[in-house]
Amino acid sequence: MALLCYNRGCGQRFDPETNSDDACTYHPGVPVFHDALKGWSCCKRRTTDFSDFLSIAGCTKGRHNSEKPPEPVKPEVKTTEKKELSELKPRFQEHIIQAPKPVEAIKRPSPDEPMTNLELKISASLKQALDKLKLSSGNEENKKEEDSDEIKVGTSCKNGGCSKTYQGPQSLEEVCVYHSGVPIFHEGMKYWSCCRRKTSDFNTFLAQEGCTTGKHTWTKKDAGKKVVPCRHDWHQTGGEVTISVYAKNSLPELSQVVANSTLLNVHIVFEGEKEFHQNVKLWGVIDVKRSYVTMTATKIEITMRKAEPMQWASLELPAAKNQEKQKEDTAE
């Protein structure tokens, strides 16, 4: 009568009369499962497939074994009728402490709230720079030069995206390749509104060739103030969000930063003739009264106090999320 061999990795039937010392090929070790790898403790082969694991040939020769291994012994739980049901409950339940209720998030205010001018703090370095350049005193002599029709050699073209300079009368006949739109910075991408070639790299953005042709604009009288992009970034702490705009020699009397709880509008005039504009729909809610602007000779820092101490996922509210908020406001 053929008997079943219970050696690990064998599982064959054998005749007890012909059983010999090398009749069985099996694994004397135990199964090992670690980090998705499967194998036997007695040999080095490992596999991630369970079917391959079952087909791993034994590593040891011996006699077939017909004795069924004993089943694992289950721990015996002794109870008595005298003990109450409460005494049989796990002890750890006695030490459970109810977690505090989560703090409810502040409801997002309406974007139509009145805008408020943030306090401007002017550093000593900016005051010294403006005094030196005589930009804050409204010098009449400079104004006359600005109003003059004379174009100096080396004057830069005022059209956006054009880097040409005036070299003489021949420059008046040159074709200007420029951007007719305005620079847009949104969710890490930079592009011009007129051609929308988006990039995340600031230097690549500055090097983008214009999409419109026309005549150079050499004087401010014709061009007005020149809207230009500025490198800017942001960081946050537990209670504040800070935006840094890298614009040199900004003019406090011509610049303003206005905000409400969820919107920020930045208008900065710097280096006499340049302007920077940025409108931001903030990801979180700010405390306008405790927010302020610090103007230095090299940059402007906008420090916004968070209405609640939480981590912002980004500076700007994503467009999709903003549309959902508008739908909710309309429904209400």
UniProtKB/Swiss-Prot annotation:
Annotated spans, Interaction with PPP5C? 2-77
- Show the ranges annotated as biased composition (Basic and acidic residues): 64-82
Q: Where is this region: Disordered?
A: 61-82
Location of N-acetylalanine modifications: A2
| Molecular-function annotations in GO | zinc ion binding
**Any Gene Ontology biological process:** centrosome duplication
PTM Phosphothreonine: list the residues: T47
The CS domain covers 227-316
- Residue positions annotated to bind Zn(2+) 2 are H27, C42, C43, C59
Residue positions binding Zn(2+) 3: C157, C162, C176, H216
Q: Phosphoserine is carried by which residues?
A: S51
* Keywords associated with the record: Acetylation, Chaperone, Metal-binding, Phosphoprotein, Repeat, Stress response, Zinc
Q: Which residues bind Zn(2+) 4?
A: H179, C194, C195, C211
Q: Which SUPFAM superfamilies match?
A: HSP20-like chaperones
Q: Respond yes or no to whether keyword Endoplasmic reticulum is given for this record.
A: no
How does this chain assemble?
Answer: Interacts with HSP90AA1, HSP90AB1, PPP5C, ROCK1 and ROCK2.
Describe the function of this protein: Regulates centrosome duplication, probably by inhibiting the kinase activity of ROCK2. Proposed to act as co-chaperone for HSP90. May play a role in the regulation of NOD1 via a HSP90 chaperone complex. In vitro, has intrinsic chaperone activity. This function may be achieved by inhibiting association of ROCK2 with NPM1. Plays a role in ensuring the localization of the tyrosine kinase receptor EGFR to the plasma membrane, and thus ensures the subsequent regulation of EGFR activity and EGF-induced actin cytoskeleton remodeling. Involved in stress response. Prevents tumorigenesis.
Q: What is this protein identified as?
A: Cysteine and histidine-rich domain-containing protein 1
Gene field: CHORDC1
